[in-house]
A protein has these predicted regions:
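A short acidic, Gly/Pro-enriched loop at the edge of an enzyme's catalytic core
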Residues: 146-158
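Class I SAM-dependent methyltransferase Rossmann-like catalytic core
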Residues: 55-81
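Conserved Class I S-adenosyl-L-methionine
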Residues: 9-11, 225-281
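N-terminal auxiliary segments of SAM/dcSAM-dependent transferases
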Residues: 1-56
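Conserved class I S-adenosyl-L-methionine
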Residues: 180-210
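A SAM-dependent methyltransferase catalytic signature shared across enzymes that methylate proteins
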Residues: 21-23, 210-225, 246-257
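A short glycine-rich, Lys/Arg-flanked "PGG" loop and its adjoining helix->strand segment in the class I
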Residues: 168-182
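Class I SAM-dependent methyltransferase SAM/SAH-binding core
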Residues: 94-97, 101-148
Length: 281
């Protein structure tokens, strides 16, 4: 039988049907109205709204590539920059990772915040299965970031969004009065060496404007910093990197394999991200 979920993490959650609080009873999360949500054998819980999610999230193959690439430590610098931004305002007690995938970025934050508990929310059940095992003080939930989040109002000290969609209104609702949102987005130079040779999508030049438009009606910008590292990757790592992200939706497996085979055996790849923090209005 799976161990109990972190009680303080469960306390953050809310029923996706009636928004009441949830408690763990046996192998399920239950609200006072009797709505019950079973815990999967892999450890995660599904808290989708009536009607389900608007999309299924990342595929099993994309999630496997992400777990392999992040597990190899290639994005350690991104996690470090994220954790620094999280801790700038003091150590949080509660952390919510929206679109958190396999939970590896959240795990890095929790390692640096020993008093905190965390919840990964992701639309992909494949990601949630891995995130459920990502850290002893974390739990994983399958949820839709574009609907009302299954999280209590004013309950979370930090919300993380790393290369994932942002729901400004719901983020503002779930943050505590002095809580902060930490957003990581790709900078213009991100993966620049691979865009031409592999036919990847370039970073949208209007990304900063779109970010402000989506968040600033609900949240106040507080800080901004950039982290840039240059990795040296072999072809297998490049294929995994491309396979884990949005580029995988635009390239078939044979197309990607052929393009990667034309690269040098080892390739310098720039990882450039902007890390921004926001507070409640």
């Amino acid at each position: 039988m799976s161990p109990s979920l972190p009680a303080r993490a469960v306390a953050l959650l809310a029923c996706p049907v009636c928004a009441a609080g949830l408690t763990e009873v046996g192998g399920a999360l239950v609200c006072a109205s009797g709505h019950s949500f079973d815990r999967a054998k892999q450890g995660h819980v599904t808290l989708l709204p009536p009607g389900g999610a608007r999309h299924d999230g990342d595929s099993a193959a994309m999630v496997a590539d992400r777990a392999a690439f992040l597990g190899a430590g290639h994005y350690a610098g991104v996690t470090e920059a994220l954790a620094e931004a999280v801790l700038d305002a003091g150590e949080p007690e509660t952390v919510l990772d929206l679109g958190g995938g396999t939970g590896q970025h959240l795990a890095g934050v929790l390692d640096r915040a020993p008093g905190a508990v965390g919840v990964v929310l992701d639309a992909s059940r494949y990601a949630a299965r891995r995130a459920a095992r990502s850290h002893p003080r974390a739990m994983a939930v399958v949820a839709d970031s574009w609907s009302r989040l299954p999280v209590g109002s004013a309950s979370v000290d930090r919300v993380l969004v790393v290369f994932a969609p942002r729901n400004g209104a719901e983020t503002a609702r779930v943050l505590t009065p002095h809580g902060q949102l930490v957003v990581v987005t790709p900078a213009a130079a991100h993966l620049g060496e691979l865009i031409g040779p592999l036919g990847l999508l370039s970073v949208d030049p209007d990304k900063t404007t779109r970010l402000a438009d989506s968040l600033e009606p609900h949240l106040v910008p507080l800080s901004e910093r950039r982290r840039e590292d240059v990795l040296v990757l072999d072809r297998a790592a490049v294929a995994t990197l491309v396979g884990m992200g949005p580029h995988a939706r635009h390239l078939s497996v044979p197309e990607l394999a052929e393009a990667v085979s034309r690269l040098p055996e080892r390739v310098p790849v720039t990882v450039a991200v902007d890390v921004r923090t926001y507070g409640r209005r």
